[in-house]
C-alpha cells in the first residue's frame, strides 16, 4: 500500500526516481512493472502497479463502445496508458504526451493513494490541496452520508 507525499524532480530526459521506500515493494510484489495513465478528473497522472492496472482494464472492458461517455473514458485512459519498468536506479521515463497532460516540467509530487500513485506538478498539487481543504469545510462535505460516521 502506498501512502504519503514525496517531492521529486524530473531529469532532463523526463525521468522520475521512485522514492526508495516504494522500490522494494514494487519490485517484490509487482516485478517493478507500472502502468501510467492520465486522471480524467484532475491534471495529474496515475501510476498503477501492473496487477492493479489489470483490475482497471477488466472494468474498462465492461464499458460500451456505443455510449459516448463510456467510450470517451476508455479512449482517454487506454489511449494514454503506458507500460514501463523501474530501471536499476528506480527511475521511470514519462513519455512527452503524459508530461504535457500533467504540465510536468521539473518539480513534482508523487502521492500515495493506497493502490496507486498520483503524480502532480508541484504547483498544481498545492492548489489542489487548498481546494480539498475548502471542500472539506463545505456544506457538501457535511451532507455526505458516506462520510457522516468517518472519524480519525
From Swiss-Prot:
Gene3D superfamilies registered for this protein in UniProt: Transcriptional regulator MraZ domain
GO annotation, cellular component aspect: cytoplasm; nucleoid
Subcellular localization: Cytoplasm, Nucleoid
MF (Gene Ontology): DNA-binding transcription factor activity; transcription cis-regulatory region binding
Listed transmembrane segments: none
Keywords: Cytoplasm, DNA-binding, Repeat, Transcription, Transcription regulation
InterPro entries: MraZ, MraZ_C, MraZ_dom, MraZ_N, MraZ_sf, SpoVT-AbrB_dom, SpoVT-AbrB_sf
Residue ranges annotated for the SpoVT-AbrB domain, each copy included: 5-52, 81-124
Superkingdom classification of source: Bacteria
UniProt similarity note: Belongs to the MraZ family.
NCBIfam families: division/cell wall cluster transcriptional repressor MraZ
Description of how the protein assembles with itself and partners: Forms oligomers.
Name the UniProt record assigns to this protein: Transcriptional regulator MraZ
Organism from which the protein derives: Shewanella sediminis (strain HAW-EB3)
Gene name, Swiss-Prot/TrEMBL: mraZ
